[in-house]
Amino acid sequence: MVTAYDILFGLTPQDAVDGSPVGTTALLQPPVAPWGEAAWGWIGDAGPGIEPRTWPRSPSTGLPMRHAVTLRLPAEYQRRGPGFPGVAYFLGGGQFATEHDASDPEDPFVVDLRAARQHPQALVLSDIIGQSFALVWLTEQELAAGPTAAPPDTRRPGEHVATDEGQNAWDPPLGTRRGEDVTVTRWAYLVPRVDDPNAGLAPGREEDGWVSPWDEDWTGLPEEERPWVDDHLGGTSEAMVDSLEGDFTPHYLELSTPTWGVDYGNRETHLVDLETGAFGIA
């Protein structure tokens, strides 16, 4: 039996549940809490404790991607086994990028870029318009390090300016998180979903029993009574998942773009499958 989980974010447990229909007693306790907070992860500029040269970079600009979320996963979502109990997701760009110049061997940015290596557990993801993102599977040690700053900016003043209208770790965020400072670390808390008829089903796979919450055959709670949030592991998605390509399974992560203060037009959620690596923005 696969359980679906909502993901709430806040400075404290009470902050996370404020405005939601659940209280702090509904929050699932993590198996370990090495960060001094009984949380499952965090959002904000700080990322996981990976080697700095393996911090994901945009294939187009060479700039380090902006950290979106680091999350410890419940056991049934650890699809690479217990040796990799968590993931980190990074936002890139590239849609409008001018290819970066890496020809000057004395340029500190070029030196830094040439020393960069892809993390051995990284998946580089692309959407249909050519934007790049990354999912990194994390060891317990990388998770336990807690919120860790991105590699320092090595650009000389005025050089290697982002040209892609995307996100990166060195420039200020392009938006706000529902009025909040998105650079600040906020903790992630999990709440098991109750009565989600799509828990354990792949999103959009109607032949396997998946039912859209907008379908007349929907048997779950009506929209105004659903306590679920936009960020979640598995279960019902309110995105237009029938338009997604790729082999999605019940073990997927869905993240809402307003959570990070970003705008991808009318596409509001990112879905990453933790089993197959399928990816889409809906």
Model-derived segments and spans:
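Preference for intrinsically disordered or flexible, low-complexity segments
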Residues: 1-282
